[in-house]
């Protein structure tokens, strides 16, 4: 017969007391929520009480989300990356961090995605640290007025619509009018100037981006450029944040007393991506189904392009950089539909920027490239940044072209024209021809100055319109071979005085006497 074990009540209470004494609680303070719905790259979570707007939310498998909608009993977040590993019922936890991307000189020459991860197969990036993608734009006190030029190397822009360092100049036009070509030429022309460039491709085909990267490499411009890509196959979330990521990478150089140029190609696709996200988050739609804060989407991005004064640079670098101003120049691109610049997003961006370069389909199709409509294009602050030679010689060009366009339309109906009108029309035709320029062939300040000098002083009046491009090319070759010192002097100082005028006059007359074009 088995022996029964009898326990005293006092022993039971002793055992319980021991267990209570030995019991320890290891707690981890975590703000966790549960996924209640997951579709179209948007996740809704219940239980994240302390989440902040714009905070990163971590999901299982290292996937992150961005909290955008904070509602009473749920949080709407957009997933950055692959959502196929997530499922309803899984947990998401707050990280206490906002979205950051790598910054630094190690990114130059690289192609990265919207989160700063390399996608060019050249190995890991040695960054100088991380920086948040959303920042407050420089205040009025910390800014400095724009007074230095960004040379694009395109005669039509540098003479008529000059861009200054720290300016925001919009490039606007229909599809296939050469918007990207202008921006890429501007990046290529910064080679050797010390200006760092960032090219942000939003919603473009991978093949288009690959061909742009190849062109930059061919012209030796990739080494001073960061390419940020959120392609057409990427999620709307990445297309929405890519411009902010690129801006942060460009700001790194501005805050260290250097000059940077950023191209957003294009902000129309970013607006589409943001509209998609907003509608999926069930935000109330407004005009053209865009959310109410679509203006703020672009204004908070473009206001970060600025020129900051030396005191601010010294403060931001903790006294390491003294006496240097920094700048970030923005060239946002907007695509219009059938030339409609009065649509919602184009009018928003026109009102935010400091001027626009308007590209015309009809001009493009008639062979005028770059197809810049000088009547609708304007630069509101760039004039103060122009070099003396460009200001002096290019001043009359814009007016002459505007008058020519007006007269050209009128002359179609008039049978007999007086001599003054005919001369003006002929001069306009010559200026139009002279403003044409091949892609990937930017000119120096001196070369542009020579071209403007010959048209301003009437040296083209006896040159047939169809020979102007060969005349200009031969003149540049002649100047480079026999008057290199003069070109160098103009490039160095950008000055224009009686002495330079006399030298240019002598050189052009010598060239015309050779008749070698």
Swiss-Prot record:
The record marks 377 as: Required for activity. It is an enzyme of class 7 (translocase). The keyword Phosphoprotein does not apply. GO terms for molecular function: ADP binding; ATP binding; proton-transporting ATP synthase activity, rotational mechanism. It is found in: Cell inner membrane. F-type ATPases have 2 components, CF(1) - the catalytic core - and CF(0) - the membrane proton channel. CF(1) has five subunits: alpha(3), beta(3), gamma(1), delta(1), epsilon(1). CF(0) has three main subunits: a(1), b(2) and c(9-12). The alpha and beta chains form an alternating ring which encloses part of the gamma chain. CF(1) is attached to CF(0) by a central stalk formed by the gamma and epsilon chains, while a peripheral stalk is formed by the delta and b chains. Produces ATP from ADP in the presence of a proton gradient across the membrane. The alpha chain is a regulatory subunit. NCBIfam families: atpA, PRK13343.1. GO terms for cellular component: plasma membrane; proton-transporting ATP synthase complex. PROSITE patterns: ATPASE_ALPHA_BETA. Keywords: ATP synthesis, ATP-binding, Cell inner membrane, Cell membrane, CF(1), Hydrogen ion transport, Ion transport, Membrane, Nucleotide-binding, Translocase, Transport. It is a peripheral membrane protein. Its EC number is 7.1.2.2. It catalyses: ATP + H2O + 4 H(+)(in) = ADP + phosphate + 5 H(+)(out). Gene3D superfamilies: 2.40.30.20, ATP synthase alpha/beta chain, C-terminal domain, P-loop containing nucleotide triphosphate hydrolases. It holds the Pfam family ATP-synt_ab_C. InterPro entries: ATP_synth_asu-like_sf, ATP_synth_asu_C, ATP_synth_asu_C_sf, ATP_synth_F1_a_nt-bd_dom, ATP_synth_F1_asu, ATPase_a/bsu_AS, ATPase_F1/V1/A1_a/bsu_N, ATPase_F1/V1/A1_a/bsu_N_sf. This is ATP synthase subunit alpha. Its main location: membrane. Belongs to the ATPase alpha/beta chains family. ATP binds at residues 173-180.
């Amino acid at each position: 017969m088995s022996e029964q074990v009898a326990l005293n009540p006092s022993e039971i209470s002793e055992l319980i007391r021991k267990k209570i004494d030995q019991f320890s609680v290891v707690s981890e303070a975590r703000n966790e929520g549960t996924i209640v719905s997951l579709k179209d790259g948007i996740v809704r979570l219940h239980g994240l009480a302390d989440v902040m707007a714009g905070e990163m939310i971590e999901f299982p498998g290292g996937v992150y989300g961005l909290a955008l909608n904070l509602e009473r009993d749920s949080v709407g977040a957009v997933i950055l990356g692959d959502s196929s590993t997530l499922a309803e019922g899984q947990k998401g936890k707050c990280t206490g961090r906002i979205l950051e991307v790598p910054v630094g000189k190690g990114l130059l020459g690289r192609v990265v995605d919207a989160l700063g991860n390399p996608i060019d197969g050249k190995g890991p990036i040695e960054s100088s640290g991380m920086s948040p993608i959303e920042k407050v734009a420089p205040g009025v006190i910390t800014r400095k007025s724009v007074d230095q030029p960004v040379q694009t190397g395109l005669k039509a822009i540098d003479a008529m619509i000059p861009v200054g360092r720290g300016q925001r100049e919009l490039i606007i036009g229909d599809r296939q009018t050469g918007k990207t070509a202008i921006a890429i030429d501007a990046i290529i022309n910064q080679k050797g100037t010390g200006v760092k460039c960032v090219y942000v491709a939003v919603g473009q085909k991978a093949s288009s981006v690959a061909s742009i990267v190849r062109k930059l490499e061919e012209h030796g411009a990739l080494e001073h450029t960061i390419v940020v890509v959120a392609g057409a196959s990427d999620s709307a979330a990445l297309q929405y944040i890519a411009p902010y990521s690129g801006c942060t990478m460009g700001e790194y150089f501005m805050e260290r007393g250097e000059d940077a140029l950023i191209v957003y190609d294009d902000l129309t696709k970013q607006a589409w991506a943001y509209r998609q996200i907003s509608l999926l988050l069930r935000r109330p739609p407004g005009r053209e189904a865009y959310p109410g804060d679509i203006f703020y989407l672009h204004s908070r991005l473009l206001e970060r392009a600025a020129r900051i004064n030396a005191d601010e640079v010294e403060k931001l670098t903790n006294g390491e950089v003294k006496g240097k101003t920094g700048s970030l120049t923005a060239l946002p691109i907007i695509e219009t539909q059938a030339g409609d610049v009065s649509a919602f997003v184009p009018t928003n961006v026109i009102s935010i920027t400091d001027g626009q370069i308007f590209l015309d389909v009809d001009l493009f199709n008639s062979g005028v490239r770059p197809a810049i409509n000088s009547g609708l294009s304007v630069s509101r602050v760039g004039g103060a940044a122009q070099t003396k030679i460009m200001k002096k010689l290019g001043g009359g060009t814009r007016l002459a072209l505007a008058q020519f366009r007006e007269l050209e339309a009128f002359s179609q109906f008039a049978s007999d024209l007086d001599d003054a009108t005919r001369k003006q029309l002929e001069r306009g035709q010559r200026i139009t021809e002279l403003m044409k320029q091949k892609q990937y062939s930017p000119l120096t300040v001196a070369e542009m100055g020579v071209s403007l000098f010959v048209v301003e002083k009437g040296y083209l009046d006896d040159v047939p319109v169809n020979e102007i491009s060969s005349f200009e090319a031969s003149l540049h070759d002649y100047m480079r071979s026999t008057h290199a010192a003069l070109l160098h002097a103009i490039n160095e100082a950008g000055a224009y005085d009686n002495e330079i005028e006399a030298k240019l006059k002598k050189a052009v007359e010598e060239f015309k006497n050779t008749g070698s074009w």
